[in-house]
A protein has these predicted regions:
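A general structural motif at alpha-helix termini
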Residues: 11-12, 59, 238
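Membrane-embedded transport module
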Residues: 18-188
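Hydrophobic residues in alpha-helical membrane-spanning segments
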Residues: 6, 100-102, 219
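Acidic, divalent-metal-coordinating active-site segment for phosphoryl/phosphodiester hydrolysis
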Residues: 1-11
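C-terminal cap/substrate-recognition subdomain and adjoining C-terminal extension
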Residues: 1, 41, 53, 264-267
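C-terminal transmembrane module of polytopic membrane proteins
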Residues: 172-173, 177-267
Length: 267
């Protein structure tokens, strides 16, 4: 009624009925329900929270992968080694490999318990300091795995071969890391098959196929300054991907009291 006007104005989000509500209520409300059906509000909250969570997932993925690239380049420079990645390879990492999984993470479906979470403080930053600590930790694990493979390969195969190994190892590790960023509270083994995301799976497969194509064709190998890989070296790349993925999962388990990785919480 008319007396609802002050309450609607004082509320964080005022909701009025489009048909049954008064003119005063509709004028001061933030949301007017055209069909007078409150069920639409529940669905809107669910989708709104999912959008907020997906933005955080995309930021988590992009910041952690870029942190890993920074660590790889700085780590090699500090010890006085040759560049582990060429400018062309870095450009490929940022323009051809990272965007597809990031875009697909933005389309992740709402998590089953999204409505059980308390509302977020609208004044809080989208990423809190605790979030950055987790993101940087994940980037360090990705970068350290690539650096370890680079230095181990460099002593036995030479700079070009080692650069090829770290290029593929880091790129594929970042692509797979997109699967680990699907949930803030559950690990990759809990979300990989229980909550399918065809868009993300397609993006990961396409990114991996593009990466494989760069290595297969002689023209792209020359363009990116890559060397042919033996079976043993290919298995080493697979080991780098597994080490970074499992490493992040294990560390996420150890720093959290529950069964899943440490959740990203906005306080």
């Amino acid at each position: 009624g008319i007396n609802d006007g002050p309450a609607l104005r004082a509320a964080d989000v005022g909701v009025a009925m489009g048909g049954a509500g008064t003119d005063v209520a509709r004028e001061v409300a933030d949301i007017v329900l055209a069909g007078d059906n409150l069920e639409g509000i529940i669905e809107a909250i669910r989708l709104g929270r999912a959008t907020y969570a997906n933005i955080r997932k995309v930021l988590r993925y992009l910041v952690s992968t870029n942190a890993s690239e920074t660590l790889v380049m700085l780590g090699a420079a500090i010890v006085g080694g040759p560049e582990p990645l060429t400018p062309m390879q870095l450009l490929w990492l940022n323009l051809a490999s990272d965007p597809l999984p990031a875009l697909a993470l933005g389309l992740e479906a709402p998590e089953p318990d999204v409505l059980d979470e308390p509302p977020h403080d609208p004044r809080a930053p989208i990423l809190a300091p605790a979030d950055f600590r987790r993101i940087l930790r994940e980037g360090v694990v990705l970068g350290a795995s690539a650096l370890a493979g680079y230095f181990l390969a460099g002593g036995a195969t030479g700079a070009v071969q080692a650069r090829t190994i770290v290029f593929h190892g880091l790129t594929l590790s970042q692509i797979v890391h997109g699967l680990s960023c699907r949930s803030e509270t559950h690990g990759i083994e809990q979300t990989l098959f229980r909550r399918p995301n065809p868009t993300l799976f397609t993006a990961v497969a396409l990114s991996a196929a593009l990466q494989l194509g760069v290595q297969i064709f002689p023209l792209t190998r020359r363009l990116f300054g890559l060397a042919p890989l033996s079976l043993r070296q290919s298995l080493g790349i697979a080991g780098m991907v597994a080490a970074s993925t499992v490493g992040n999962r294990v560390i996420g388990y150890l720093v959290h009291d529950g069964p899943g990785p440490r959740p990203l919480v906005v306080r």
